[in-house]
Design a protein with these regions (language model features):
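Thiol-/selenol-based redox modules, centered on thioredoxin-like
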Residues: 77-139
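Alpha-helix boundary/interfacial micro-motifs
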Residues: 11, 43-45, 74, 105, ...
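Solvent-exposed, non-transmembrane alpha-helical starts
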Residues: 1-2, 81
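Sec/Tat-exported extracytoplasmic proteins
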Residues: 11-15, 44, 65-73, 132-139
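Generic preference for well-ordered secondary structure
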Residues: 21-24, 45-49, 76, 80, ...
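Short, charged low-complexity intrinsically disordered segments located at boundaries
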Residues: 35-38, 67-74, 91-98
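Structural microenvironment flanking redox-active thiols in thiol-disulfide oxidoreductases
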Residues: 2-64
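Structural micro-motif
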Residues: 49-51, 62, 69-74, 83-90
């Protein structure tokens, strides 16, 4: 849920642009049907036509997460909800490439923390906003 709250911040900043979009992939496709996801988007008051809540075959979703984006997600009956994930955002450019940056030591930062909130370090959200601005030539 924190991820979607933070994604709403990004949607509020960029959601009216034709050159920006958000894809949220469920990792619980057995419960998150297209109808359920539509109701959820209404519940959290998504206004942008460019924010898509996506579901599909469980194996395909987990393969996309783990192998395509290289972002961990897994079924885990021992945790609340029965699944776990890293809570990262990936920034994909218009050509389909995952964008990244380097830290002060030259180490690549490929993903952005999406589970931060106002009571924690918001560095991941601030970094993705900066990088979106660069991609959209806003700064």
């Amino acid at each position: 849920i924190e991820m979607n709250k933070n994604m709403k911040i990004l949607d509020g900043l960029y959601g009216d642009r034709d050159d920006f979009g958000i894809a949220s992939f469920t990792i619980d496709p057995e419960n998150d049907t297209p109808t359920t996801l539509k109701k959820y988007s209404e519940l959290i008051e998504v206004k942008s036509k460019n924010w898509h809540f996506l579901t599909g075959d469980k194996k395909d979703i987990y393969d996309l997460s783990n192998k395509g984006f290289n972002i961990f997600s897994s079924i885990n009956e021992a945790v609340e909800g029965g699944f776990e994930h890293q809570g990262f955002f990936a920034l994909i450019d218009k050509d389909g490439y995952i964008r990244s940056r380097v830290n002060d030591y030259g180490t690549p930062i490929v993903y952005y923390s999406g589970i931060t909130n106002e009571n924690e370090d918001v560095q991941g959200i601030e970094m993705i906003k900066e990088d979106i601005d660069k991609l959209l030539n806003l700064k």
